[in-house]
């Protein structure tokens, strides 16, 4: 993936403003609520019976935080995103058997919570860079499936 200086600046700027402990749980909870079939991978997380249970679930919150920290690894290594996510790609495909389409669903939920957080600062240019970054992450997480 080729990154312009502007895209690098935008992506780093976005992530520097994010509170992972707040937005991670919101994004992951949203994914489990909006796309309930994604819950099948998280049966060990306990009560996922309804939106309130999901949003109050400590395991869901912890995983959401973990996801954003995982994205942060990509931000810090934008020139080697494939390398950053190679091990996670193998884990999700070979051991966990996660449907790779779910990565896109979660990335959409992350975009929504980031857009809500940034408000008017989430301009079309900002969104384009953010979507390009998330698209690269999704692509490389799904690499083992091909």
Curated annotation (Swiss-Prot):
Tissue expression as described in the entry: Red blood cells.
Top-level lineage group: Eukaryota
One GO term describing the cellular component: blood microparticle
Single Gene Ontology BP annotation: hydrogen peroxide catabolic process
Amino acids binding heme b: 63, 92
GO molecular function, one term: haptoglobin binding
Residues annotated as domain Globin: 2-146
Subunit relationships: Heterotetramer of two alpha chains and two beta chains.
UniProt family annotation: Belongs to the globin family.
Name of the featured protein: Hemoglobin subunit beta
UniProt source species: Artedidraco orianae (Barbeled plunderfish)
Encoding gene, per UniProt annotation: hbb
């Amino acid at each position: 993936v080729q990154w312009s200086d502007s895209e690098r600046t935008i992506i780093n700027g976005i992530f520097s403003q994010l509170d992972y402990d707040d937005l991670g749980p919101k994004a992951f909870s949203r994914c489990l609520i909006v796309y309930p079939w994604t819950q099948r991978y998280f049966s060990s997380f306990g009560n996922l019976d309804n939106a309130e249970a999901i949003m109050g679930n400590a395991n869901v919150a912890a995983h959401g935080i973990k996801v954003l920290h995982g994205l942060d690894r990509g931000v810090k290594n934008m020139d080697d995103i494939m390398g950053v996510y190679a091990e996670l790609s193998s884990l999700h495909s070979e051991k966990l058997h996660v449907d790779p389409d779910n990565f896109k669903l979660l990335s959409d939920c992350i975009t929504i919570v980031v857009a809500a957080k940034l408000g008017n600062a989430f301009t079309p240019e900002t969104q384009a860079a953010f979507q390009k970054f998330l698209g690269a992450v999704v692509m490389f997480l799904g690499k083992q499936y091909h």
